[in-house]
UniProtKB/Swiss-Prot annotation:
EC number: 2.8.1.10
Gene3D superfamilies linked to this entry: Aldolase class I
Catalyses which reaction(s): [ThiS sulfur-carrier protein]-C-terminal-Gly-aminoethanethioate + 2-iminoacetate + 1-deoxy-D-xylulose 5-phosphate = [ThiS sulfur-carrier protein]-C-terminal Gly-Gly + 2-[(2R,5Z)-2-carboxy-4-methylthiazol-5(2H)-ylidene]ethyl phosphate + 2 H2O + H(+)
Organism: Azotobacter vinelandii (strain DJ / ATCC BAA-1303)
Listed GO MF terms: thiazole synthase activity
Protein name in UniProt: Thiazole synthase
Keywords, alphabetical: Cytoplasm, Schiff base, Thiamine biosynthesis, Transferase
Places the protein is found: Cytoplasm
Pathway(s) this gene product operates in, as recorded in its UniProt entry: Cofactor biosynthesis; thiamine diphosphate biosynthesis
One Pfam short name: ThiG
Root EC class: transferase
GO biological process, one term: thiamine diphosphate biosynthetic process
Stated family: Belongs to the ThiG family.
Signal peptide limits: none
């Protein structure tokens, strides 16, 4: 029997990936733990906060690229720590210089330090500039379906609505908005932020997300490497469940076995 839905490759900027789990590089105790967790996750795309992580801009300091080989992983520079469109654009251009013309970036422009909620006005400004400048923009945004639509129409190659606030581990706080975004999507939709454990990642994939990006859920686990393995399997399970199509929810019970031929 064929699945309820047809699977399709996970493709970004013309490149296809086997793993639908994207991982961050912050908050680990050291670079070796970072390397082990990323390897255990099976991820092929690794995101890096350019303003906080040395990828060559600080000679003489430990370089993340010494343990995360760009020949093996797609490096996804992000603009974490930026609070204006101008800061974000400048950071992306720096990343392009450091990574020899690399065009794939993750845009995030934050509103304040307490919530780390996206500033959608500044995000829209930055996205417009970056797209015109030739970047392939994956964009962190709120779970507002209208903003997600506008970002896609602007030319962003993927929209990444938050599931919960960054670093909170609250899980999928508003699955209904995510469903609307997914139903209207013309570009890949990835959950970004809020995942706390494997079941959260599975739920995101069961909703129909193309992939999930996470950092804190792995790095803050008591055993980050083991959690990375759990997330790998959670993503795969959620995707398979979405393809299979879940049974409908019912108010009343329905017997698993037919009444015909019942022994009396």
């Amino acid at each position: 029997m064929s699945p309820a839905r047809n699977d399709k490759p996970f493709t970004l900027a013309g490149r296809t990936y086997a793993s639908r789990l994207l991982v961050g590089t912050g908050k680990y105790k050291d670079l070796e733990e970072t390397r082990q967790a990323i390897e255990a996750s099976g991820a092929e795309i690794v995101t890096v906060a350019v303003r906080r992580t040395n990828i060559g801009q600080n000679p003489g300091e430990p370089n993340l690229l010494d343990v995360i080989n760009p020949a093996r992983y797609t490096i996804l520079p992000n603009t974490a720590g930026c609070y204006t469109a101008e800061e974000a654009v400048r950071t992306c251009r720096l990343a392009r210089e450091l990574l020899d013309g690399h065009k794939l970036v993750k845009l995030e422009v934050l509103a304040d330090q307490k919530t780390l909620f996206p500033n959608v006005i500044e995000t829209l400004k930055a996205a417009e500039v970056l797209v015109k400048d030739g970047f392939d923009v994956m964009v962190y945004t709120s779970d507002d379906p209208i903003i997600a639509r506008q970002l896609a129409e602007m030319g962003c190659i993927a929209v990444m609505p938050l599931a919960g606030l960054i670093g909170t581990g609250l899980g999928i706080c508003n699955p209904y908005n995510l469903r609307i975004i997914l139903e209207e999507a013309t570009v890949p939709v990835l959950v970004d932020a809020g995942v706390g454990t494997a079941s959260d990642a599975t739920i995101a994939m069961e909703l129909g997300c193309e992939a999930v990006l996470m950092n804190s859920a792995i790095a803050h686990a008591q055993d980050p490497v083991l959690m990375a393995r759990a997330m790998k399997h959670a993503i795969e399970a959620g995707r398979l469940a979405w393809l299979a199509g879940r049974m409908p929810k019912k108010l009343y019970a329905s017997a698993s076995s037919p009444l015909e031929g019942l022994i009396r």
